[in-house]
């Protein structure tokens, strides 16, 4: 059983040949341990006697053996990341040196920290709630600009503040019902059901908005899973190369050059695109190419976005129609490619077949004339993706994005309980029923900020962190 009252240490920087390495120490004995191995330029200085949030130059010694020239930062409790006494030793980088200093710190009384234990202590000591702790790992793992912004917004309290406010409203109603039931002579329940119903309705609307944001929140965090489809030699690989910014796919005039799946993570106006270039969709006897076609359709089924590249220089055929039929249930963009050549497929022709194979939703599918060879229309295509998923605007000032599936599930549970409150009022059920469902909603929202969670869940969340954080 791990104790959270001892002193821990870990390397807080990447294990590489970097210019600087940082060893972090936290706990009651952090400063006294540092004093055992740190010698300031002024040998009389002891870190235990210095002011908090001060920086000190000196040396790290191990049994009077010089190890490195360092800068030490002292942060005294409770004004630190963990709220505990904290020391950060800034030494020269390099795996060997950083590890040697860490070993010396452990030798003099610290324990090697578990992954995420510094942030876990910040949570257990009440400095941050659980949603803010989860934001830390989201920031660390951010793959694009908007994922980073979503993480920092959550760390600043965008989710926490919303949850706390809703819980306060629920708690007010619970307290009123309980007080009225305990003292019916002095507290009247007359007309209270209408007020509680209005409160529940208002909260359901707020929670529904948060739940609805989770789809875009997932995309901000993980990126848009995008599949490029089209028949062979339509220009799919050329499009992939333009998006990536270098030649990842082989481009030739020979149909069927791409026979397997190519995957790339691309940043597009701050949004992440997980792009998959697929084998051209066509009937083929080539076993390898056939497997590639089957893979293409399998990936397309799971995609958030299908990009259908149409070769406008040749007539449409059954391969094109098969892709159109597949697009009925998918967000899609059509690129009418090879606009630099003599075209035989017009936008009007394409719309006619789309209406036949896709139905009414065909009107919502953008058609953009492009030339991947001449880089024509690609800027319009990129803007269209942003418009399609975020109405052209991604704002963190007036919009909260739920990026965590655990939070979404908790919100859904709270919404169900509040809907039960409304139903109980409609059915004229006893007041006890209202109180039970309100308490259930209160508890569900509490799991988001860590007030109603078990040790196993807390351990699972922090196990995903890296060492030293």
What are these regions (language model features)?
Residues 1-149, 153, 157, 333:
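A glycine-rich (often HGG/GG-containing) alpha/beta subdomain
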Residues 2-11, 15-18, 145-267, 284, ...:
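C-terminal-of-GTPase-core extension/linker across diverse P-loop GTPases
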Residues 56-67, 72-76, 256-284, 302-305:
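Switch I (G2) and immediately adjacent beta-strands of P-loop GTPase domains
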Residues 93, 243, 278, 310-313, ...:
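Glycine-rich, N-terminal phosphate-binding loop of Rossmann-like dinucleotide-binding domains
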Residues 289-313:
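Inter-motif core of Ras-like GTPase G domains
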